[in-house]
Amino acid sequence: GNRILLNILQSIEAVSIPASLLIYGLSTSDALSTYGVLTGMALPCILFPSALTNSASTMLLPAITEAQTQKNVQRIKKMIRSSLCGCIFLGTGCLAGFFLLGPALGRLLFHSSLAGEFIRTLSWMCPFLYANSALISIIHGLGKTGISFLLNTLSLFIRIIGVLYFTAYWGIPGYLHCLLASQIFLFVTGILYISYHLRQMLLSSHYNT
């Protein structure tokens, strides 16, 4: 049920982007072209390195679950610290690379200067985007799938609001900035929840002893 709702929200987001670009004033062909450049060229570039973080996150989940079962807070903290540092390090490197080389990549790979502009703008998402895959896996590993669903849903709502309001008034830059805002939201709330959960575990173990 949760997965279906997320898919429905993602579909609403996808359908709303060209519609909001029409309201902004683009022609139908320009709106669809801009949407195609964003989703078919720029975003795949930004998401490509996340294959590494997604693989690492998949391996992280059972390790976190095991440590949670053992109530080993220190081990969980160590895994969280190392995984987040790795993701943020990769994300910062990709931010620098995509920001500096975005226009060149757009021309070289897609023969599109617009794709290059999008890659450069989206580069700011990289540290948060890559770290969030680890954060969501950690929350799953802690047995809190409902929390990860809630955070993902709220993040999607930020993007949908961005499409319906900011894209209609400011064009595609409005949507790109809301994409960044949604990833920052997911990152901050994920960190806050994990910190809260670990504090509760420590308190619980303290009272049990």
Regions found by a protein language model. Give the residues of each.
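Junctions where cytoplasmic loops transition into the N-terminal start of transmembrane alpha-helices
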Residues: 2, 35-42, 78-91
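Interfacial/gating helices of multi-pass transporter permease domains
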Residues: 18-47, 116
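Hydrophobic, small-residue-rich membrane helices and short re-entrant helix-turn-helix hairpins
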Residues: 28-31, 61-81
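Residue-level recognition of transmembrane alpha-helices
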Residues: 40, 87, 119-122, 126, ...
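Helix-loop junctions and terminal segments of transmembrane helices
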Residues: 46-70
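Short membrane-interface helical motifs at transmembrane helix boundaries
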Residues: 93-111
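Membrane-interface junctions at transmembrane-helix termini in multi-pass inner-membrane proteins
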Residues: 124-154
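Membrane-interface helix-loop junctions in multi-pass transport and translocation proteins
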Residues: 143-146, 156-188, 196, 200
